[in-house]
Amino acid sequence: MSQTALPPALLLIVATEPALRLRLEWLERAGYRVRTACSLKEVDQACQSQIFDVVLIADSVEPRMKKAIGHSVRHHLPEAPILQMGRIRPDLDGNSFVTGDSREGVLQSVLKILKGRDEIRPAAI
């Protein structure tokens, strides 16, 4: 009996353009599939077309936009964990986590969230 390998976790990163490239590189090198968004419209489109294992909102996103993005994710994907880099928006209900903005902090936080969901792992594990 052969086991079929599960695909690596699918992540959505929301950030301003310069921050986006760096985080994309970190996560792809760690073996994750990653989709990016730079605006609320792009977040809406992404969340309507795919189910993400984790949504990351970078610290480069202004606080009012973080709130709107968080509410959009909750509307389309109520169970998706949201990992906020930098300061957390306390008004985002549900699975919301916070991490620093270092490469190690982001990768460790994503892995910890996914380990709570046994069926999902990055490709490198």
Question: Whereabouts are the PLM-identified features?
Answer:
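A short, hydrophobic beta-strand element within the central beta-sheet of small alpha/beta folds
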Residues: 70-73, 79-91, 98
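Short acidic active-site motifs
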Residues: 39-43, 65, 102
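Two-component/phosphorelay signaling modules centered on CheY-like receiver
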Residues: 17-35
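Structural motif
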Residues: 13-17, 38, 57-61, 85-87, ...
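Conserved phosphotransfer microenvironments
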Residues: 55-77, 93
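Acidic, metal-coordinating helix/loop segments flanking the phosphotransfer/catalytic sites
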Residues: 38-54
